Amino acid sequence: MKTLTSQGIRTYGRLLQATKQYWPIFLIGVVGMIAVSLSDAGFTWLIKPIINRGFIARDLVFIRWLPFIIVLVFLFRGAANFLSTYFINRVARNIVMDFRRAIFSHLLRLPAEFYDRHSSGHLLSTVIYNVEQVAQASSDALIITLQASSLVVGLLVVMFLVSWKLTLFFLVITPLIAWVMRVCSARLRHLSTSVQKSVGEVTHIASEAIEAYKIVRLYGGQKYENEKFRHATKLNQQRELKVVVTNSVGTSLVQLLIAIPIAIVLFFATQPSFHVTAGSFASIVSAMIMMLRPVRRLTMVNSYIQKGIAAAESIFKLLDEDVEKDRGERHLVRARGAIEYQGVSFAYDNSKKTILSEISFSIEPGQMVAIVGRSGAGKSTLINLLPRFYDASTGVIKIDDINIKEFRLQELRNQFGLVSQHTTLFNDTILNNIAYGQAGSIDKRKIIEAARAAHAMEFIEQLPEGLDTVIGENGVRLSGGQRQRIAIARALFKNAPIHILDEATSSLDTHSERHIQAALDNLMDQCTTLVIAHRLSTIERADWIMVLEEGRLIEKGTHQQLLTLNGAYAELYRMQFAEKPAAMTALDE
């Protein structure tokens, strides 16, 4: 338990350290909270003279001033309460904003293998849910802790001033209260961590089903997804209820422990041998009863703090993840486009299986090279090593005769354009999607040229808002072919010296494909192009073709040379084109 507690203290200390820039604002809120507590405690002290001097002694001067005193006390309390609530919550919302920005910025710099290990649902849960838990720990918990504890201290001072003997009875149960809170604290921390994991699972299942809604419906997966979601939400509900039970039991025990000394005080105060004025008795009993609420709130704040610490631990764990290694110092404005692989092998971390083995080849600037092979042969992995989404396990990759690890990472990636069969677009305008990531002012004329070259202007001009049309999440408002043409226009606009085409025309109709292929041919004349090919008819004019099988480069040559070789490529070619005549025959019949 001590280890858990010390870890929690370190986490909370790191949380406070991360928010130290807001301490001046925070101190204003603290002063306001203390002022609120002092005014509440002061009002219980006023009960003694109100009864003794107002109702018993009938002090007319005191009675005359009493209404003004009460109004002033509550005016003071109202102003102090505004200061405390506003400034503490301002700090909390700033913390939420800062953490979300820090997490998002960090996520954009994490390596590809991190995303291989984590689902998007769990990451979204950290950004949204866990950060809010930290906000509660830094606002609600701090407000309650400081305000309630200062009120308890103020009430104890009032009780000592009124009757120190009666107050001692009350203090006897303090160690028991501390023990109950400590036991509840350990359990709440454990439960809070499990609740956050269950929320991440709920988010993951929901986001996955929403993104794949077409597949879910086409394959009748509604029942299966519903069962998964029901199970995840049930688990989350059970864990949340365990938190509620633990919190409620702890609060009830603390209230019971406080009620016992109140009963004892009432018993002794009413004994004839115990001399106490009516005002003193009313004041001390009022203080004791008033203390029930802040003590109850202090036991509840334990739940907030434990949730906040558990959430902060997950946030700091994410922020402590190593970002992509970028030790390169060479500048690379625009590459010529020469590419060389020298004995490159690759295996994922903690995996014994080799994905690529001893791959060697070189590409001259301006060449078009196709990569073919069966599914799982390593085609995509081979390409992913080039912009350093992954680093080769052994061997060297060069661009323009220089090891790619020597270049600054972003400058290296600026040399590539990508058009994939799995098109990625953003919930933004067509114009911003085409010009995505390009710094500086956007030249609309060049965007139109790129869109026209990609044959995208044909449908863009028919849209009411043209290039300013917002296309929805991943371009949901466009057809598959239209989305693909936007992606091609984006690559044309970037005009990078090296282009990666992953079956770039797969979503286009035959008419559009001819025009796009012509545009891509013009682009290939000016840059080096790597084509991951599934349809072999699209790569017959490649300068040369490499064939991968189980991570090894087994054949290399032009289309005609590989057909003459009558090896793996020729077999793939015959398989594809044997289907085409059969399909045409069926159509003729």
Swiss-Prot record:
It is a multi-pass membrane protein. One of its GO terms (biological process) is transmembrane transport. Residues 339-575 form the ABC transporter domain. It is found in: Cell inner membrane. It is an enzyme of class 7 (translocase). One of its GO terms (molecular function) is ATP hydrolysis activity. It catalyses: ATP + H2O + lipid A-core oligosaccharideSide 1 = ADP + phosphate + lipid A-core oligosaccharideSide 2. The chain crosses the membrane at residues 23-43, 60-80, 153-173, 249-269, 272-292. Pfam families: ABC_membrane, ABC_tran. Its EC number is 7.5.2.6. Gene3D superfamilies: ABC transporter type 1, transmembrane domain, P-loop containing nucleotide triphosphate hydrolases. Residues 27-307 form the ABC transmembrane type-1 domain. ATP binds at residues 373-380. Keywords: ATP-binding, Cell inner membrane, Cell membrane, Lipid transport, Membrane, Nucleotide-binding, Translocase, Transmembrane, Transmembrane helix, Transport. GO terms for cellular component: plasma membrane. InterPro entries: AAA+_ATPase, ABC1_TM_dom, ABC1_TM_sf, ABC_transporter-like_ATP-bd, ABC_transporter-like_CS, ABC_transpr_lipidA, P-loop_NTPase, Type_1_exporter. It comes from the Bacteria. Homodimer. Belongs to the ABC transporter superfamily. Lipid exporter (TC 3.A.1.106) family. Involved in lipopolysaccharide (LPS) biosynthesis. Translocates lipid A-core from the inner to the outer leaflet of the inner membrane. Transmembrane domains (TMD) form a pore in the inner membrane and the ATP-binding domain (NBD) is responsible for energy generation. In MsbA the ATP-binding domain (NBD) and the transmembrane domain (TMD) are fused. This is ATP-dependent lipid A-core flippase. The gene is msbA.
